[in-house]
Amino acid sequence: MDQLKIAIFGSSGAIGSALCRKYIQQENVEKVYCFSRQITEVKHEKAHCFILDYLDEENLSTISSEINFSFDIILISIGALLNPEKSIKDLNVEKFNNMISANTLPTLLIGKYFLPKLNKNRISKFASLSARVGSISDNFLGGWYSYRASKSALNMIIKNFSIEINRTNKYSIIFGLHPGTVPSKLSDPVKIKNK
């Protein structure tokens, strides 16, 4: 059985680092490529860690062009959540634009340069962490305008990836994951504010 090659973007965060640690323990995994804006605290012979600005398209292009192999799994664990609006009165255009950018552009750019790196000879997976609050049909509480809109946009990006990649890679599976609320630097400020 071939050994898996896995890429994890956002590997210094709570979920990303946990995924890195989990995958390096699996016998069927050859290498885990950990990408993050900060140093990833995962030390293991299977882990190859890189510091990467997800919004630096030139850097993403360079790194992807230097990779001469395919990935079996690509996971994106990147996002932002700051001071969600409880009412439309709380909306701030600059914060809205920042939220949309933070929760969509990294996945778009990673997809642009790394979707072609998915293994075309066997089942390969590309997943991005999203959030259930991005669901239009599941929104019964309202509020959180910027975050909800950014996650809805991310969900549409993931759906578009799935449609497009299926035309060229019949073995690929593209999907979004809803991890729920995970204790982390991302969710802690919201929990404190809502107490």
PLM regions and their residue ranges:
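Conserved glycine-rich Rossmann-like NAD(P)H-binding loop of the short-chain dehydrogenase/reductase
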Residues: I24-V42
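N-terminal Rossmann NAD(P)H-binding glycine-rich loop of SDR-like oxidoreductase domains
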Residues: I8-Q25
